[in-house]
A protein has these predicted regions:
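Start-of-helix signal in alpha-solenoid helical-repeat scaffolds, especially tetratricopeptide repeats
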Residues: 43, 92-95, 99
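N-terminal alpha-helical interaction modules that lie
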Residues: 1-84, 102, 107-139
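Solvent-exposed loop and edge beta-strand segments that line ligand/cofactor-binding
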Residues: 34-38, 89-94
Length: 139
């Protein structure tokens, strides 16, 4: 029997590449601003900046940092084969920077009254991996 086969399970999870130098710098306690300046593609540095700004009540700065980390992560997801949907597992450490940036983007959007963006971010995070929504508190 010939014919097409269909994958009924959906797309494979997308795993972002390791960025060992940038990760090592953050893990060693380097200032996230320094890491972001030296490794501007590294979403985790932007997510760290966004989280710190949000916790300090600097919502607009948090939004800007988070948006940068989010867009840098989207670029990398696309290069890794992501088609705009499908799982982005929280358990894979390189994915966490993007997912954390997405969460802070949603939180900051909600705080400044961007309800539609808040809802989009919340849905995107949960669709990427429910564990990410749980870990970041954006549910």
């Amino acid at each position: 029997m010939g014919g097409m086969t269909h994958n009924l399970l959906g797309p494979e999870p997308t795993l972002l590449p390791e960025h060992t130098a940038a990760q090592a710098a953050l893990d060693a306690g380097s200032d996230p601003a320094t890491v972001a300046a030296e490794h501007p593609y590294y979403s985790e540095a932007w997510a760290s900046l966004a989280e710190k700004a949000f916790e300090a009540g600097e919502t607009v700065a948090a939004y800007a940092y988070a948006r940068t980390g989010y867009h840098r992560g989207l670029d990398q997801l696309r290069r890794a084969g992501w088609k705009g949907f499908g799982p982005v597992p929280w358990a894979h450490r390189p994915n966490q920077g993007f997912l954390r940036a997405l969460a802070v983007l949603g939180k900051a959007a909600g705080k400044i009254g961007e309800t539609e963006e808040y809802d989009r971010c919340r849905t995107f995070l949960a669709d990427s991996d429910p564990a990410a929504a749980e870990a970041t508190g954006l549910k």
